[in-house]
Amino acid sequence: MEQVVIVDAIRTPMGRSKGGAFRNVRAEDLSAHLMRSLLARNPALEAAALDDIYWGCVQQTLEQGFNIARNAALLAEVPHSVPAVTVNRLCGSSMQALHDAARMIMTGDAQACLVGGVEHMGHVPMSHGVDFHPGLSRNVAKAAGMMGLTTEMLARMHGISREMQDAFAARSHARAWAATQSGAFKNEIIPTGGHDADGVLKQFNYDEVIRPETTVEALATLRPAFDPVSGTVTAGTSSALSDGAAAMLVMSESRARELGLKPRARVRSMAVVGCDPSIMGYGPVPASKLALKKAGLSASDIGVFEMNEAFAAQILPCIKDLGLMEQIDEKINLNGGAIALGHPLGCSGARISTTLLNLMEHKDVQFGLATMCIGLGQGIATVFERV
């Protein structure tokens, strides 16, 4: 079986969905920009040698519809002979895109793939056109489709207080801002054209979603966003609404070395699981445990984790049940997470994996794990190993 390696990984800056940098930039353009950039950064690989493109996107309608992967590839002037497919596993879409490409390479059906994902939540809102079947309520709670309420349930079940949530959210912004100031994101962010507040076209090379002024005291003043009577989850402890894309160049190890391309990491194991939709945010726990089992590792073997911060009240129970509460500041989301950077649904899996690779190199650790919860009760995880 072929070894699957990540040769390169990049992303756009994360733009605010409300009147942000990419308010006049389409999702296909964000995607095409990264496809072109990955190929330009790795000239040893000819675009025509790509076997497939796997691109995650959740709201596949309007500008994100009709197979955005192919539309973006055509815009990027990828040769017409290279196919492309759009992948949808809700929040886990671009990580699923990575898994799909990895399996193709493992079986010998592909040697080189572009993977990634995009979501322009400013142009195509998360709830656009959603119409749940009324019969679902016979099998799952009606609130299972409301992510904020499922998070309130997790918080109550695991004793996650409002104070714990506010502290974690403030940490996310502080760490993301520190990473920005230190240049930690420089190797992953590709400058991307957008418009500033005055409408002037400019290149953005930073995440405009981060709020460096965030404090626990300010967060404590916010009202509950989903359960106004007894809730603890606020807008400030939820992932920000943002627009962005991320991409990775995935190859067989033999092809990468043949072309003289240096692999950054191997895909050691992959896992996807289902869980109760009423506590959809708990999915990273069984997904991570399964991925670790497949890799023959334990949580203590992992040097750094990237866990998507859908909500502070969602990630904290996962950290607790993976036995990592005492290691948050040494291992978990060291450059902040989605509370500060946002969670453009189809982009996030590739985004957290990209950040993880850079952290693994910076911290000089052998193993890293990226994981995320998925709406309606799923979890996905990937274990990476430095080469």
From Swiss-Prot:
GO terms for cellular component: cytoplasm. It is an enzyme of class 2 (transferase). Its EC number is 2.3.1.16. Pathway: Lipid metabolism; fatty acid beta-oxidation. It is found in: Cytoplasm. The keyword Acyltransferase applies. Its main location: cytoplasm. SUPFAM superfamilies: Thiolase-like. Keywords: Acyltransferase, Cytoplasm, Fatty acid metabolism, Lipid degradation, Lipid metabolism, Transferase. It comes from the Bacteria. Catalyzes the final step of fatty acid oxidation in which acetyl-CoA is released and the CoA ester of a fatty acid two carbons shorter is formed. Heterotetramer of two alpha chains (FadB) and two beta chains (FadA). HAMAP family: FadA. NCBIfam families: AcCoA-C-Actrans, fadA, PRK08947.1. This is 3-ketoacyl-CoA thiolase.
